Amino acid sequence: MVIHLLAIYGGLPYCLNNRVKMGLENLEINSNVYRYIEKTNPAKIITIGSGCEYPGYLDGYLKEEDLGAGKLHQSVIHYGYSKLMQLQLCYSFLQERGTQFEHLVLANMYGPYDRFDLHNSHVVGGIIYKFKEAMKNNDVIKLMGTGAAVRDLIYVDDVSEMIVRLLQKDVLSNRPLNCGTGVGTPISTLVNLLCQKLNYHKVEWGNASEDGALLKVLDMSKTKDYLNWTPETSLEEGLDKTLDWYFNE
């Protein structure tokens, strides 16, 4: 079996400023991995995709059948298409060699060992970093948007658990599967929780034009039916573990 986790990725600033690097290096990574698969002919492949694979115009609860139904958002086009290419190559290996596969379409993952900075982090890591930096000098935390945007936030251990459950399957389903919580969390709720847990409330929001899509949550019905499982870590518990690691590493 091959489990393909490797990718070059980052937050929105990184994606916007490193399009060539992301495009070329993810092509090279995928080429090397699938050349290895071609050479070694494993029975099964598990690949990690991204919610960036979904069409940019979609807003709401995202279902696997929507993949490939439209153009990706310009801000993540290189990363998103590299993940869609993984999926298409999985289909090709299935058709030509009978190689079973599972392609996990990942929500916004967070947890210990995440990236915590201004340029390469995703939403949770980036906001936690802003809290830590502001708290050093009692500064105001300046955040993009109004906090109204709703996102699907999944703790890293739950992603690992889903992969383990797939490893225990004798036969894979040969399709993409969403890997999220299916629960939408407004960014304002995330920030309020962090304010309470860190006892720091100096937050300044931006404007509505920075919110992006107001609702992007992964529909988990197919995953739940297939694995008889849903993620177990609540946002509060996941944040507690993440903050404990980050502030005490």
Describe these PLM feature segments:
Residues 12, 47-63, 78-84, 96-97, ...:
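Conserved catalytic-site region of short-chain dehydrogenase/reductase
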Residues 127, 133-249:
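C-terminal substrate-binding subdomain of Rossmann-fold SDR/epimerase-dehydratase oxidoreductases
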Residues 30-31, 84-91, 124-129, 160-161:
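Conserved active-site helix of classical SDR/Rossmann-fold NAD(P)-dependent CH-OH oxidoreductases
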Residues 1-25:
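NAD(P)H-binding glycine-rich loop region in Rossmannoid oxidoreductase-like domains
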Residues 49-50, 87-115, 125-127, 135-143:
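Conserved beta-loop-beta element that borders a ligand/cofactor-binding pocket
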Residues 4, 31-76, 102:
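Conserved Rossmann-fold NAD(P)-dependent oxidoreductase catalytic core, especially the SDR/UDP-sugar
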Residues 23-27, 71, 75-87, 117-125, ...:
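Short-chain dehydrogenase/reductase
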Residues 16-31, 35, 42, 81:
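Catalytic Tyr-X3-Lys loop
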